[in-house]
Amino acid sequence: MLIADCLELMGFSDFYGNADVIHRLRDMLARNRFPHAVILAGPAGSGKYTLSLMLAKAMNCLSPILTEDLPDFCSKCSNCVRIAQAEDLDTRFTEAIEAREGLRETDKKETRLFVQTHPDVLVIPPDPPQMMIKVDQVRRVIETIYFRPGEAKERVYIFSDSAFMKEAANSLLKVLEEPPEFATIFLLADNPGALLPTIRSRSMICSLAALPAQEVEQYLAKYRPDWNSKQRALVARLSEGAVGRARSFDLAAYTAARSHALTILGSALRNIDHSELFKVTETYRAGAEGREKTEKLLRTLYSLLQDLTFLNSGTPELVRNTDIQADLKKLAESSDFNWIAFVSDRLNDVERGMRRNLLRSLSLDAFATAVEQEVPNR
């Protein structure tokens, strides 16, 4: 999934959390010892993309400043302003897809997705429908990286995902073996282990840690005053320490999906009337909107299963859906670890079915029937 923390960034002081990591990166900039390839690792919403753009600004700011005796950017010069236009990655990504859809069919197949709001800063997102970095995208990097920047001090390339097709990953290795002195490559990875070992060995890995829930709540108190304290506490736990994810969290959509998830699990565990279950599954239709809705439901089901695991293992303090803990306890009383593992496997089956374009409502009905048959002591 592609999410950017769309802040009006004024400097490194606006990056929330991971102060030691930011200090180390800025110190390397100050000493002109910044590596040519950096893997920014951390969970979705931890600020990897935001930080990569901040560093691109700091490298290329026309009126650089010092804060805390370390390099910072002005946010006002032409380079900073143009780089900032790439901050809303979701919107830029959608625009790129729409632009490609407007091409002739023969041109569509040969056109790869890029986001570029500054001539010397190129963002390379995963290319649909596989949502992976493709070899033609890496070839574009190879074609341009050895030319000196035209309007900036440093060419910057940002791969917004670590999912590379095999040929693309091998092509990237060639660049990493002999990078030019005036170019920097950022690889953003939820899991750096997904990258080839040879790519990792040629890059500096910089990890952004998840923040404590209390810090995320403090952040939300400032940036989401429309939420009450209980809502902020819930989102802080659900976002797993990622402030970008927390700030953009769609609470209404999540609670709607959670209501459906509870109906599905409750139907299986409590052996109740299935009419409500079928009313729920019938709403998951074909098409892009239905696919997104189903993906949210599956993520929510996984979240509830994790909470059931915490309750069954005697660690209720780890439960994330704290506002429905009473409902979860009732479900936990009827479940065990084997059943939870079985349900997780069946969710994987639904996901595989989605990739084969199976009818979602029927897949969910089959899922609910299967998990009911495995309920303990029935």
For the regions a language model picked out, list residue spans one by one.
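Glycine-rich, phosphate-binding/catalytic loops in enzymes
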Residues: 57, 140, 174-176, 204-205
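Clamp-loader machinery-focused feature within the broader ASCE/P-loop NTPase space
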Residues: 2-167
